[in-house]
Amino acid sequence: MVDWTDAERAAITSLWGKIDVGEIGPQALTRLLIVYPWTQRHFTTFGNVSTNAAILGNPKVAQHGKTVMGGLENAVKNLDDIKNTYAKLSRMHSEKLHVDPDNFRALAECISVCVAAKFGKQAFTADVQEAWQKFLSAVVSALGRQYH
């Protein structure tokens, strides 16, 4: 269990309240597939993801980005039980999809870049980023729990 201060909880929930999952999710997943091209192998059912232009125009990438952000919303709503919130998803990514857990860190980084670009230094202050990174680290850790 992660120990959250009241200030961290407030920063995470406030930032989350400003995030448009339909904007940030597709941007973050698109960025992941472009910046870390080896992750494309996990998305073969999405059709063409072989070029930057194909990724940018792929509606399945955009939809899955929204799905990912919906999963993050579950963590925001369950800050005190992130590990159990992600147990089933961790098992699926480990046993069925065989996703390298380092990819979760890469996606978290892409989400942070997109959030920082969207909100800038006025809203995404160092204090907010500190809480946000702690939150994403907890999510990444929870997603990696079921790996052998």
UniProtKB/Swiss-Prot annotation:
User: What are the protein's GO molecular function terms?
Assistant: haptoglobin binding; heme binding; metal ion binding; organic acid binding; oxygen binding; oxygen carrier activity; peroxidase activity
Keywords for the protein's UniProt record, in alphabetical order: Heme, Iron, Metal-binding, Oxygen transport, Transport
Q: In which tissues is it expressed?
A: Red blood cells.
The answer to keyword Iron applying to this record is yes
Supply the PROSITE patterns for this chain.
Answer: GLOBIN
Could you tell me which CDD domains the record lists for this protein? Hb-beta-like
Start and end of every Globin domain?
3-148
Q: What is this protein called?
A: Hemoglobin subunit beta-B
Q: Which organism is it from?
A: Seriola quinqueradiata (Five-ray yellowtail)
